């Protein structure tokens, strides 16, 4: 083991007690938890739904597995039921990732409310931090809550596909095919990175409420939290009190090769960002190499990002990616 490896490991081990204490898992062992199983979907608010639909179907060849009202359709990721939804941003809402959804076995809204109440989340008629609310979409109950920063989280049954029926699990028997084959076949959701005002507080919330274990470290005090049995996860980063939100989403593909993916993106019109600084502009790509001090491989773990027509940041990684070390980020705890 190299000196830098020993240094990183030593600092991670020293950080463990503080992280566990901040999580509250040891301090509050008797509170019930909501055991989430998987990431289900994300909803993007976009300035031009037709343009975004053409973009995501053109790049990924995503079929439509269901429709909700006037939306452009729910774009299936892999074999489903996971999906990407598009909605018009409107004059008072900026484009971005509005919310993400996780699934629960035997979803029961009433029982979920009781568990959340034990953690200080109160039932409400309106969104807000530490609030929970439901809405009826036809005969489908859709459950939402706000985390400590008010970031929107949806909870549904594991069978939920955004369709009809009490559980929202009745989708098209045959999805509407994409008009374009697509250049990259995405297989699943990997993770969401949340920009939060207080990482310790948010980490405590997600670990206590959902029983999430630490799956990997991206730095001594930056654990990522497993969703279900992994490799899916949530990552938390401090973005300042004025900027809580969902910073980016990640999807996976087979045979991930950064150079080939960058070329494919360029052929589609998503050009390399180069040396530009600050927030990425629309339709650019870039690779960040996560080194050993941030839990990456000794030679670096490449992490590939691109932006859509609204500048919404997306990440692409291998299907084995778990946010850990290794050349594919596939080595986790």
Which ranges hold each PLM region?
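A mature extracytoplasmic/lumenal domain signature
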Residues: 60, 79, 88-90, 101, ...
């Amino acid at each position: 083991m190299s000196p830098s490896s020993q240094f990183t490991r030593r600092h991670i081990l020293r950080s463990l007690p503080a992280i566990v204490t901040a999580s509250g898992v040891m301090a509050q062992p008797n509170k019930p938890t909501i055991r989430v199983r998987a990431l289900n979907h994300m909803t993007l608010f976009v300035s031009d739904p037709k343009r975004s639909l053409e973009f995501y179907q053109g790049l990924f060849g995503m079929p439509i597995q269901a429709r909700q009202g006037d939306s452009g359709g729910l774009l299936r990721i892999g074999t489903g039921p996971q999906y990407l939804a598009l909605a018009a941003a409107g004059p008072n809402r900026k484009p971005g990732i509005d919310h993400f959804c996780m699934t629960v076995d035997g979803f029961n809204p009433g029982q979920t409310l009781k568990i959340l109440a034990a953690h200080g989340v109160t039932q409400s008629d309106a969104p807000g931090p530490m609030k929970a609310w439901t809405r009826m979409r036809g005969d489908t109950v859709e459950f939402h809550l706000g985390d400590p920063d008010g970031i929107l989280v949806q909870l549904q049954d594991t069978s939920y596909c955004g369709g009809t029926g009490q559980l929202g699990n009745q989708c098209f028997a045959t999805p509407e095919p994409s008009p374009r084959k697509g250049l990259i076949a995405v297989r699943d959701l990997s993770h969401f990175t949340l920009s939060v005002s207080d990482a310790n507080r948010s980490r405590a919330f997600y670990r206590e409420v959902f029983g999430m274990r630490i799956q990997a470290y991206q730095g001594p005090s930056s654990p990522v939290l497993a969703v279900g049995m992994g490799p899916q996860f949530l990552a938390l980063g401090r973005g300042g009190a004025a900027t809580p939100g969902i910073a980016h989403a990640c999807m996976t593909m087979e045979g991930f090769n950064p150079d080939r993916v960058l070329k494919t993106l360029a052929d589609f019109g998503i050009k390399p960002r180069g040396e530009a600084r600050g927030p990425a502009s629309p339709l650019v790509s870039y690779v960040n190499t996560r080194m050993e001090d941030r839990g990456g491989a000794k030679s670096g773990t490449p992490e590939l990002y691109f932006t859509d027509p609204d500048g919404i940041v997306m990440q692409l990684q291998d299907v084995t990616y778990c946010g850990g070390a290794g050349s594919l980020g596939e080595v986790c705890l």
